């Protein structure tokens, strides 16, 4: 793979990259979806309050087209009449139509931009770069946005033209209908016009959802080197991690070896395995493993045992099973009670021999070890 190919952003963004993107304010923003929701809530509000809207419209028309000579003779009356029309009717009408839409816009803004970042309001000299501006103008995203905008404008214009030519003109220029009928008819026609536009926008918005999601993840794609560097930064350099594991393992081993001197017996396979066991019948319900190791660690355990005159028992099978079936700091499993009991009985005989003297206790050679434990031990070694 050549250098150019290795630098291509072909990898999906990691969870850390997505988190950083959210913190810096680069979120998915479904502009078309929020436009649809605002239009929907406005349309529902319009239909729900249509009686009140009609009443306010009638009052506005009545006050506007009613001639009262006394009003025009006094400027104060004229101003008062205008304010009355504006305050009592027009503001109420605008509030009914637009206030629910404004209320709905704030949750939409909060949902899409839950993290407010003031970095975007800082001055950036790169924004004045004409080359970058030219690239943004002719980017795929800009072309798609332009296409969607043109498509919406064309359709809305066609729908509005058809509704005006088919419904409004024949009613507005006819003298056979009353004013109330024309007003009611106009409100219903406006509602149907907006509903038609809303229905048409649905497939556009569904396509836009998939496009915005694809474009968002595409903009966050990473090169393989970026993914590798990010993993190193998050999890650490593999060499450093290996060194840390070695240090932790060394500390754990030193702590474990410090407990060998407290053990009652060490079971060994002469060359490879060593397991230190302790049992205190007053505060232990079973023998406990204080230390275990193989190769160099086993040699250290045996050396510490010799320095502290701890009895050492050689048993190939028992050493293997104890090493693979137990953990340091834990009690031995119940299936090994009988075998370990023989070892501890031998240890107690040695202690008695040291006090009373006599013949040195015979070292046990055969131990009861369930066959399934021995088979598991062989498989684990393999």
Swiss-Prot record:
The keyword Signal does not apply. GO terms for cellular component: plasma membrane. InterPro entries: T3SS_substrate_exporter (IPR006135), T3SS_substrate_exporter_C (IPR029025). The chain crosses the membrane at residues 33-55, 90-112, 150-169, 189-211. One of its GO terms (biological process) is bacterial-type flagellum organization. Signal peptide: none annotated. It is found in: Cell membrane. PANTHER family: FLAGELLAR BIOSYNTHETIC PROTEIN FLHB. Keywords: Bacterial flagellum biogenesis, Bacterial flagellum protein export, Cell membrane, Membrane, Protein transport, Transmembrane, Transmembrane helix, Transport. The keyword Ubl conjugation does not apply. It comes from the Bacteria. This is Flagellar biosynthetic protein FlhB.
């Amino acid at each position: 793979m050549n250098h150019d190919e290795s630098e291509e952003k072909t990898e999906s963004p990691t969870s850390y990259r997505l988190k950083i993107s959210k913190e810096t304010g680069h979120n998915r923003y479904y502009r078309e979806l929020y436009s649809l929701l605002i239009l929907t809530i406005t349309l529902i509000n319009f239909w729900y309050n249509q009686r009140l809207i009609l009443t306010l419209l009638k009052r506005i028309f009545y006050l506007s087209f009613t001639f009262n000579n006394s009003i025009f003779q006094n400027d104060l009356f004229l101003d008062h009449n205008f304010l009355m029309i504006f305050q009592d009717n027009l503001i109420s009408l605008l509030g009914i139509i637009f206030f629910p839409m404004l209320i709905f816009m704030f949750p939409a803004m909060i949902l899409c931009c839950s993290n407010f970042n003031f970095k975007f309001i800082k001055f950036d000299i790169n924004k004045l770069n004409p080359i970058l501006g030219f690239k943004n103008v002719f980017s795929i995203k800009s072309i798609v946005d332009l296409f969607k905008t043109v498509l919406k404008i064309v359709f809305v214009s066609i729908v509005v033209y058809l509704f005006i030519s088919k419904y409004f003109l024949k009613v507005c220029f006819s003298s056979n209908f009353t004013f109330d009928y024309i007003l009611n008819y106009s409100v219903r026609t406006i509602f149907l016009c907006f509903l038609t536009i809303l229905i048409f926008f649905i497939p556009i918005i569904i396509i836009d959802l998939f496009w915005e999601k694809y474009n968002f993840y595409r903009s966050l794609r990473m090169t393989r080197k970026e993914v590798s560097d990010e993993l190193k930064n998050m999890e650490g350099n593999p060499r450093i991690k290996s060194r840390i594991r070695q240090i932790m393992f060394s500390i754990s081993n030193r702590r474990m070896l410090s407990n060998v001197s407290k053990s009652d017996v060490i079971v060994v396979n002469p060359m490879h395995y060593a397991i230190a066991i302790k049992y205190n019948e007053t505060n232990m319900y079973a023998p406990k493993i204080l230390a275990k190791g193989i190769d160099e660690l086993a040699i250290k355990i045996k050396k510490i045992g010799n320095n502290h005159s701890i009895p050492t028992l050689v048993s190939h099978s028992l050493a293997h099973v104890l090493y693979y079936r137990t953990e340091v700091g834990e009690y031995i499993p119940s299936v090994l009670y009988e075998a370990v009991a023989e070892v501890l009985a031998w240890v107690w005989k040695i202690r008695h021999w040291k006090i009373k003297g006599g013949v040195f206790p015979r070292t046990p050679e055969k131990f009861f070890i369930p066959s399934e434990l021995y088979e598991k031990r062989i498989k684990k070694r393999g």
